[in-house]
């Protein structure tokens, strides 16, 4: 499919750090900030796909040293972070053939300046794990550094959340993206840039808000990450779980609202348990999937 101009500048791959020496545990980051408040200028929560999908509040379990695009002379003025990167990252980067990464060893290999510019005015952004069986987007606070294993959407729109959480988006992604084992390997250029998005409607805004609020409450109350929660949603043996039934109902409403926004009133979605890509999922039926991508 053709890449669409209206979708450009929205979906980005996160930052490619390249060097475990940049990464700190939460306690050490807080100790460094307590030792010198200026360190807060270069220390940030660091979120990867595993944390996003496994932690009930989708929060980062680690922090990262991020000098941004600062020159070396300025990076030196943050002694603790600089010393860590000097001793742990520089020796590894010295072995690299790519000159920029070797010579600018105190910087991320890919800092994602376009992503940062696109999200600079937002208090939160939508993210999706790049490799995932769940393939569900969630909002996170802006200011968290996303790893290159996250896809970031420069938007705080609840209607876009609904669109990305819909079966239409999932079926499109499965058709046009790669796979890693049975998991979806999401490529923004192949999936989001080519996806003809529906008209934004009030119904999509409203059901996107419902999904965001109710799913978050269920995850926190039951101490479940996205992967474990959606494993329950896709488990045909689970028939009498009110939270799971509610989440399935929300996704039916999301799909109905999305199809309506596209103007596809004649598609019978046939929600239920269907075999898809060698696994059983709670999703739309085979005939609906064919109509969606045709």
Where are these regions (language model features)?
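S-adenosyl-L-methionine
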Residues: 1-294
């Amino acid at each position: 499919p053709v890449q669409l101009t209206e979708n450009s500048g929205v979906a980005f791959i996160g930052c490619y750090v390249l060097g475990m020496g940049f990464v700190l545990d939460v306690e050490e980051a807080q100790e460094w900030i307590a030792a010198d408040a200026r360190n807060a200028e270069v220390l940030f929560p660091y979120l990867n796909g595993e944390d996003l999908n496994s932690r009930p509040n989708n929060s980062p379990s680690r922090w990262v040293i991020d000098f941004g695009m600062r020159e070396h002379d300025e990076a030196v003025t943050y002694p603790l972070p600089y010393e860590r990167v000097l001793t742990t990252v520089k020796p590894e980067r010295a072995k690299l053939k790519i000159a920029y990464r070797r010579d600018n060893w105190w910087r991320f290999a890919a800092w994602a300046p376009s992503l940062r510019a696109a999200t600079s005015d937002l208090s939160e952004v939508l993210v999706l794990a790049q490799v995932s069986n769940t393939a569900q987007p969630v909002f996170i606070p802006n200011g968290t550094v996303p790893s290159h294993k996250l896809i970031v959407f420069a938007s705080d729109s609840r209607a876009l959340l609904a669109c990305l959480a819909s079966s239409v988006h999932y079926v499109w992604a499965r058709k046009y993206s790669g796979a890693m084992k049975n998991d979806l390997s999401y490529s923004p250029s192949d999936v989001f840039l080519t996806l003809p998005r529906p008209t934004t409607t009030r119904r999509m805004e409203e059901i996107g808000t419902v999904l965001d609020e109710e799913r978050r409450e269920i995850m926190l109350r039951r101490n479940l990450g996205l992967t474990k929660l959606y494993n329950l949603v896709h488990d045909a043996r689970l028939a009498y779980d009110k939270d799971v039934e509610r989440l399935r109902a929300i996704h039916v409403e999301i799909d109905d609202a999305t199809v309506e926004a596209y103007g596809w009133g004649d598609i019978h979605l046939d929600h239920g348990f269907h075999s898809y890509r060698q696994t059983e999922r709670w999703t739309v039926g085979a005939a609906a999937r064919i109509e969606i991508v045709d």
